[in-house]
């Protein structure tokens, strides 16, 4: 059963400018693992923008619990390569209350826009 659906669209250039203007923003929004690729290289702004969109989409799918931190939602890569979410803190509690047992995540981006679509399933 679908518990919630969320989507978000992020302007890559504007997001990159925000990261440049406020270097600590990346640490407040992304976990250390999200800021790096599997081989340890820094993620591109485009990739980070897509992950930010996924965090926003996940919050929308659950109705944005108050007091949530962006790092309560981590975009991870499943064993088969698909993106997925690992939730913690208040977001995890909200997901548990709503009976969420699985997350379905789709990310896409080009040079200008990044988008995410998230389905919370029970």
UniProtKB/Swiss-Prot annotation:
GO MF annotations in UniProt: holo-[acyl-carrier-protein] synthase activity; magnesium ion binding
Annotated compartments: Cytoplasm
Lineage summary: Bacteria, Bacillati, Actinomycetota, Actinomycetes, Pseudonocardiales
Any GO BP: fatty acid biosynthetic process
Protein name: Holo-[acyl-carrier-protein] synthase
Keywords linked to the UniProt accession: Cytoplasm, Fatty acid biosynthesis, Fatty acid metabolism, Lipid biosynthesis, Lipid metabolism, Magnesium, Metal-binding, Transferase
Matches recorded under InterPro entries: 4-PPantetheinyl_Trfase_dom, 4-PPantetheinyl_Trfase_dom_sf, ACPS, Ppantetheine-prot_Trfase_dom
A GO cellular component entry from the record: cytoplasm
